[in-house]
């Protein structure tokens, strides 16, 4: 157990029996009231966001974690098969552990898997940006290129991304895996 004042953003704690990652932690001292810490956390099992006020003297259970690099190999039903970059051992990761960014997983991409002290998978972090090829989108006309609108495009992983009008089939684009938004066209 450690004091809440020693916890920072990105720490993983056991809150109400389940692992939560601290997304933001703000110390507040309102007027003549006692100080407290306002925490925004994400439940790593359910993916839900939780807000909680910790008193300044409260202690929390900090989970000891280990981060390892893995390479995505293929999908097996609802599981994703990953290979350890050091030992070449393969593990199955549930879709829930990866979250909505799983739609941007493509063969050979490196991910960071966070393991808890008991060996269970807490979280899977994809790279912030990935480069994917546009497989299907409506063709752009000369008039469309002058406007700043967007159109839907299906990328090689099967995800749908909203892209500018000038993007065509075969274009390689950079996408933010956290939000699923188009960032830029990659010139090769």
Swiss-Prot record:
GO biological process: peptide biosynthetic process
Chief location bin: cytoplasm
GO cellular component, one term: cytoplasm
Single GO MF descriptor: translation elongation factor activity
Key words of the record: Cytoplasm, Elongation factor, Protein biosynthesis
Pathway(s) served: Protein biosynthesis; polypeptide chain elongation
Stored InterPro entries: Elong-fact-P_C, NA-bd_OB-fold, Rib_uL2_dom2, Transl_elong_fac_P/YeiP, Transl_elong_KOW-like, Transl_elong_P/YeiP_cen, Transl_elong_P/YeiP_CS, Transl_elongation_fac_P
PROSITE patterns named in the record: EFP
Subcellular location: Cytoplasm
SUPFAM superfamilies on file: Nucleic acid-binding proteins, Translation proteins SH3-like domain
CDD domains with a match to the protein in the record: S1_EF-P_repeat_1, S1_EF-P_repeat_2
A Pfam family recorded for this sequence: Elong-fact-P_C
Membership in a protein family: Belongs to the elongation factor P family.
Function (record text): Involved in peptide bond synthesis. Stimulates efficient translation and peptide-bond synthesis on native or reconstituted 70S ribosomes in vitro. Probably functions indirectly by altering the affinity of the ribosome for aminoacyl-tRNA, thus increasing their reactivity as acceptors for peptidyl transferase.
Protein name listed in UniProt: Elongation factor P
Origin species: Chlorobium limicola (strain DSM 245 / NBRC 103803 / 6330)
């Amino acid at each position: 157990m450690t004091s809440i004042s020693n916890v920072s953003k990105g720490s993983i704690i056991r809150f109400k029996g389940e692992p939560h990652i601290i997304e933001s932690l703000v110390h507040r001292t309102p007027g003549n009231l006692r100080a407290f810490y306002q925490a925004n956390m994400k439940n790593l099992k359910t993916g839900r966001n939780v807000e909680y006020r910790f008193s300044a003297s409260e202690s929390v259970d900090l989970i000891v974690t280990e981060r390892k690099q893995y390479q995505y190999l293929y999908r097996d039903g609802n599981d994703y098969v990953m290979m350890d970059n050091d030992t070449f051992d393969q593990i199955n990761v549930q879709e829930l552990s990866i979250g909505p960014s799983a739609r941007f997983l493509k063969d050979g991409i490196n991910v960071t898997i966070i393991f808890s002290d008991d060996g269970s998978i807490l979280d899977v972090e994809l790279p912030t940006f990935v480069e994917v090829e546009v497989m299907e989108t409506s063709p752009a006309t000369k008039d469309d290129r002058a406007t700043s609108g967007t159109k839907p495009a299906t990328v090689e992983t099967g995800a749908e991304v909203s892209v500018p009008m000038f993007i065509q089939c075969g274009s390689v684009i950079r996408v933010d895996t956290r939000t699923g938004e188009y960032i830029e066209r990659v010139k090769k």
